């Protein structure tokens, strides 16, 4: 299965920094509406010990979303599997009506469509670079803006 390249993986891991449990999420919008915000959701985490080493598989969704006629639309929504060894894209959704699952688990083993999953990984390598270019706050050198006064007082 094809993983993200090093540059894209670094960006991905920065985006999910601090998100560790199912249900953890964040929205990054540093452009004031110029570009679509990025929504990040932890869908699941499986932790186990293999040969005395801690191991995890974290399933994460990264998405650009918009509302059309009251419905939340994906533009796109990509599901990833992150492990200590790398980050691999699993599925792609683009509304209206496009959904492709290129990698899945079957009886505890990973199965994947080689060409489709590799194409998705290539797309995601560029998408991570685009997200960084669009959402990285160069003044603060972070994806995450400083908390507002209201956030620090709460």
Stretches found by the model and what they are:
Residues 1, 148-154:
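Short intrinsically disordered terminal tails
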Residues 4-7, 32, 54, 112, ...:
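Non-membrane alpha-helical secondary structure
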Residues 72-142, 154:
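An exposed acidic His-Trp-rich patch
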Residues 1-36:
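N-terminal "first-domain core" detector
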Residues 27-83:
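Amphipathic, interaction-prone secondary-structure segments
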Residues 5-8, 40, 62, 126-127:
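Generic hydrophobic, helix-prone segments enriched in Leu/Val/Ile
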